[in-house]
Amino acid sequence: MSTVRKITLKSSDGENFEIDEAVALESQTIKHMIEDDCTDNGIPLPNVTSKILSKVIEYCKRHVEAAEKSETTADAAAATTTTTVASGSSDEDLKTWDSEFIKVDQGTLFDLILAANYLNIKGLLDLTCQTVADMIKGKTPEEIRKTFNIKNDFTPEEEEEVRRENQWAFE
């Protein structure tokens, strides 16, 4: 029986999180720190608060568990003569879980994007950015400004010039 190596992550507000190495390896940034043997006193993450780090860890744990589950299912299917399509249902379960996970307030969503980018977690970055893209899709510039609380700093003349230059986007 092998022991699971633990990695300590330190949030910007001083909280420590001890997680399995497999979960930590979901982050390319942390993976490189582990490879460079920079984990002795924990890995400081100055750009990630404990609130956001706990959400990131939750996401990574779930995705590691899902990957392990689908590997086990694939191994079991390969061992039997009849193959089943059980991995399809776990993919659907994960998509459902992701869609529930990402139902957060705007501030948290943007902090998750920043953390996913900093930690280089492609799946989480894709999920969060797609969520923002879906929030924008089909909206006018005014609606987008209202959604994201963006102040319009264009003069009417500048706005008209942008509309002319990007006519294709307004059709």
Swiss-Prot record:
Main location: nucleus
Gene3D superfamilies linked to this entry: Potassium Channel Kv1.1, Chain A (3.30.710.10)
SUPFAM superfamilies associated with the record: POZ domain (SSF54695), Skp1 dimerisation domain-like (SSF81382)
Pathway: Protein modification; protein ubiquitination
Tissue-specificity statement: Expressed in tips, cortical layer and epidermis of roots. Detected in whole seedling, vascular tissues, pith and vascular bundle of young stem, leaves, inflorescence meristem, young floral buds and organ primordia, flowers, developing seeds and through the valve of siliques. Expressed in male meiocytes, pollen, embryo and endosperm.
CDD domains: BTB_POZ_SKP1 (cd18322)
Keyword entries, A-Z: Auxin signaling pathway, Chromosome partition, Developmental protein, Ethylene signaling pathway, Host-virus interaction, Nucleus, Ubl conjugation pathway
UniProt subcellular location: Nucleus
Stretch list, region Interaction with the F-box domain of F-box proteins: 113-171
GO cellular component terms, A-Z: cytosol; nucleus; plastid; SCF ubiquitin ligase complex
GO biological process, alphabetically ordered: auxin-activated signaling pathway; chromosome segregation; embryo development ending in seed dormancy; ethylene-activated signaling pathway; jasmonic acid mediated signaling pathway; protein ubiquitination; response to auxin; response to jasmonic acid
Known partners and oligomeric status: Part of a SCF E3 ubiquitin ligase complex composed of SKP1, CUL1, RBX1 (RBX1A or RBX1B) and F-box proteins. Interacts with SKIP1, SKIP2, SKIP3, SKIP4, SKIP6, FIB1/SKIP7, PP2A13/SKIP9, SKIP11, PP2B11/SKIP12, PP2A14/SKIP13, SKIP14, SKIP15/FBX3, SKIP16, SKIP17, FBW2/SKIP18, SKIP19/FBL20, SKIP20, PP2B1/SKIP21, SKIP22, SKIP24, SKIP27, SKIP31, SKIP32, SKIP34, ADO1/ZTL, ADO2/LKP2, ADO3/FKF1, AFR, COI1, EBF1, EBF2, EID1, ORE9, PP2A13, PP2B10, TIR1, UFO, SKP2A, CPR1/CPR30, NUP58, At1g55000, At1g67340, At1g78100, At3g04660, At3g61590, At4g38940 and At5g49610.
Summary of the function given for this chain in its UniProt record: Involved in ubiquitination and subsequent proteasomal degradation of target proteins. Together with CUL1, RBX1 and a F-box protein, it forms a SCF E3 ubiquitin ligase complex. The functional specificity of this complex depends on the type of F-box protein. In the SCF complex, it serves as an adapter that links the F-box protein to CUL1. SCF(UFO) is required for vegetative and floral organ development as well as for male gametogenesis. SCF(TIR1) is involved in auxin signaling pathway. SCF(COI1) regulates responses to jasmonates.
Family statement: Belongs to the SKP1 family.
Listed name of the protein: SKP1-like protein 1B
The organism's taxonomic lineage, starting at the top: Eukaryota, Viridiplantae, Streptophyta, Embryophyta, Tracheophyta
